[in-house]
Amino acid sequence: MQRITIDPITRLEGHGKIEIFLDKEGDVANTYFQVPELRGFEKFAEGRPAEDMPQITSRICGVCPTAHHMAATKALDALYKVDPPPAAKKIRELVYSAF
């Protein structure tokens, strides 16, 4: 099995790497995203209302709070099985494009 390693990865505060394993046909068989630092936010979030997560996760990192906020918001969309209206999708795109 062929392995592709991207180490270090950029646009990440701290350390991290990605390992991609390809099968005999060259298709991705498995992928691992590894970040060795434990931040402990998972424990901090346990027992909290899901609706609080965008505000809590935006404090994970001082470099990219918006990305964490938006990821938590998308997770809420999936949790509640909602599709944001087109205007909201455009606004989210604009926010992502600001960085």
What kind of feature is each model-predicted range?
Residues 2-99:
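Active-site- and interface-proximal helix/loop "cap" or "latch" segments in soluble metabolic
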